């Protein structure tokens, strides 16, 4: 039996599910009557999604489709950081959506401060873009997870690496 138990708090997403969601968006764009002739492009890069279309109204429709497809694939809406809409050539608009991955130092400090303030038997340490939480009892860790799920952070939190 281990003397201490721990888990990691990370902010990540399933890349393959995102690829599938973007593929579904592209398929939807080709089949929807109102979007068929807009020459809308959706390109998935390593750290961003680029959308190019003919109007801001169409862009908003693509946003809604992307959010819907991502939600159906259990991807959090918090991974999308919508950039500003730029004008492109030929009366077109373009927007880059940055994909958020990892917990920033500020958010990691907020999480560890919350854990230190509310749970005296639990230790939290920041390790790069993750937070490691450890305690002597598994029950304490489960209470911490429940408490963190109640908070609303600007990134999606996942709890991994249970030991």
UniProtKB/Swiss-Prot annotation:
GO MF entries: nucleotide binding
InterPro entries in UniProt: DUF520 (IPR007551), UPF0234-like_C (IPR035571), UPF0234_N (IPR035570), YajQ-like_sf (IPR036183)
Keyword Nucleotide-binding: yes
Keywords per UniProt: Nucleotide-binding
Transmembrane domains' residue ranges: none
GO CC aspect terms: cytosol
UniProt KW Nucleotide-binding keyword: yes
Family, as annotated: Belongs to the YajQ family.
Function text: Nucleotide-binding protein.
NCBIfam families for the chain: PRK05412.1
The protein's name: Nucleotide-binding protein all4662
Species the sequence originates in: Nostoc sp. (strain PCC 7120 / SAG 25.82 / UTEX 2576)
């Amino acid at each position: 039996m281990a003397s201490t138990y721990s888990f990691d708090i990370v902010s990540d997403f399933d890349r393959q599910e995102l690829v599938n969601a973007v593929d579904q968006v592209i398929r939807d764009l080709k089949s929807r009557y109102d979007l068929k002739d807009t020459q809308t492009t959706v390109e998935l890069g390593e750290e961003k999604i680029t959308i190019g279309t003919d109007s801001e109204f169409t862009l908003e429709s693509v946003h809604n489709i992307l959010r819907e497809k991502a939600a159906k694939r259990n991807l959090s809406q918090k991974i999308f950081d919508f950039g500003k809409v730029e004008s492109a050539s030929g009366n077109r608009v373009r927007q880059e959506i940055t994909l958020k991955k990892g917990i920033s130092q500020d958010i990691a400090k907020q999480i560890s401060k919350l854990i230190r303030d509310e749970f005296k038997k639990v230790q939290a340490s920041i390790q790069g873009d993750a937070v490691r939480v450890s305690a002597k009892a598994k029950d304490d860790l489960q209470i911490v997870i429940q408490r963190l799920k109640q908070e609303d952070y600007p990134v999606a939190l996942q709890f991994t690496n249970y030991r």
